[in-house]
Amino acid sequence: MKSSSHLKQEALNYRFNSNVPLKLYLTTCISIVEEAQNSARCNNMERAYLLYIRYLDLCLNRLVHHSEVNTSVESLYKREYFQLLKLEVPAIMKITEELKIKIDARYKSLANNVATSTYVRSPAVMTTNPSDEINLPSSFDEQKFNQSISWFNHSSKHFSAQSDSNNEYPELPELNATSTSVTYTMPAL
């Protein structure tokens, strides 16, 4: 789950090229709104919010500086763009605000329910207490202990060498491909 501010950052991360025709950007705007509406219907609020923010940024911040919008020549696409600004943008701004409230509430709820670590890391320097030391019994013979470890290591190597020799598989008979012939006949058409 992402916060609305994180989603907004993602939404604003796209390339805009003012040399692309306005007609193509208007078609893109329609596609973005349709995809956002589909995401909202599927209860994917994060994706819907991201797409609506991208749409608003495209309409309000990027297309305003497009060369076809800034010309004095009236065109169908320029009128369509102003129609978007007048009719669609206010409605989408309202939808976006509602989604932002829902996303932030869900994000806050999840953030409050996330388990936090209570483990406190001990300092890097280890201090030993005399009570923490382990005292070996007086009957402990370190030389015998080392011999036992050595014998165990040697016997395990010997055992693994024996088990490897048991893994040999018998040779498989070879098939002679030249002695077998297969003929194919094509059916008459």
Curated annotation (Swiss-Prot):
MF GO annotations: cysteine-type endopeptidase inhibitor activity
Main localization category: other
A UniProt-annotated Pfam family: USP8_dimer
Subcellular location field: Endosome
GO CC aspect terms: endosome
Gene3D superfamilies: Phosphotransferase system, lactose/cellobiose-type IIA subunit
InterPro entries attached to this UniProt entry: USP8_dimer
Superkingdom per UniProt: Eukaryota
Keywords: Endosome, Protease inhibitor, Thiol protease inhibitor
Keyword Ligase: no
Function recorded in the entry: Inhibitor of the DOA4 deubiquitinase involved in the regulation of protein degradation by the proteasome and maintenance of a normal level of free ubiquitin.
Family classification: Belongs to the RFU1 family.
Protein name as it appears in the record: Regulator of free ubiquitin chains 1
